[in-house]
Design a protein with these regions (language model features):
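ABC ATPase NBD coupling module
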Residues: 70-85, 109
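Conserved ABC transporter NBD signature motif
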Residues: 61-72
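Conserved H-loop
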Residues: 187-193
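A short, proline-enriched helix->beta-strand linker immediately N-terminal to the Walker B motif
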Residues: 152-156
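Conserved ABC ATPase "signature" region
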Residues: 71, 111-130, 180-181
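Helix-to-loop junction immediately C-terminal to a conserved catalytic motif
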Residues: 53
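Conserved ABC ATPase signature
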Residues: 133-137, 141-143
Length: 213
């Protein structure tokens, strides 16, 4: 296995048992690698992330995370036991929770919760927003919060599904710089789904077209 974090072997998916949305995908992502998955709308990019996260069941094939098979023909490991994080385009923050409580939602039983939240608030430069609710902060601040929340449990693999597509160019570039610095500091393994080749080149070392794997 070497230092691989994720291995996909002959992974296929079908929503209705007839129309194939993903067909025999094989891919390896190594520790601290930053990979972008490119492809046109409807090519299955988001579905691929949902399969890895355990939110969809594959038609066939194997998903291995940190040397452990989490999905094959015989069993399916629950999403919360896969040690992966997923950030989606719509941010999916809990509207009734503050920024601080959103970030801490997935680590409520962690004894180091207070320190982890404090460190992430500082890292993403949102300490001053800790008591604010999602509707009280900007789109960029919401996205910072969403990424911080996904990193709170220290996932081995952080997956980003078109996370900046709703933001303007200036804000995107600001977040690119911040996120690259954070990823480097934490040696975080990243899988980014995007249709934007320029974004992929800025945020990843390896750009892969889904139609070619």
């Amino acid at each position: 296995m070497g230092d691989s974090i994720l291995e996909l072997k002959d992974l296929s998916h079908s929503y209705d048992g007839s129309e194939i949305s993903l067909n025999n995908i094989s891919l390896t992502v190594n520790k601290a690698e930053k990979v972008s998955i490119l492809g046109p709308s409807g090519s299955g990019k988001s579905t691929l992330l949902r399969l890895i996260a355990g939110l969809e069941k594959p038609y066939s094939g194997t998903i291995t995370i940190q040397g452990k098979v989490v999905s094959d023909q015989d069993h399916l490991v629950a999403p919360e036991k896969r040690n992966v994080g997923l950030v989606v385009q719509n941010k999916a923050l809990f509207p009734h929770l503050t920024v601080e409580k959103n970030i801490g939602f997935g680590i409520r039983k962690n004894r180091e919760k207070t320190k982890i939240i404090s460190d992430l608030l500082s890292l993403f430069k949102i300490e001053h927003l800790s008591d604010k609710y999602p509707h009280e902060i900007s789109g960029g601040e919401q996205q910072r919060t969403a990424i911080a929340r996904s990193m709170a449990p220290s996932p081995e693999l952080l997956m980003l599904d078109e996370p900046f597509s709703a933001l303007d160019r200036e804000l995107k570039e600001e977040l690119y710089t911040e996120l690259n610095q954070i990823i480097k500091e934490r040696q975080q393994t990243i899988m980014l789904v995007t249709h934007d080749l320029d974004e992929a080149k800025v945020l990843s070392d390896n750009q892969i077209n889904l139609e070619n794997i």
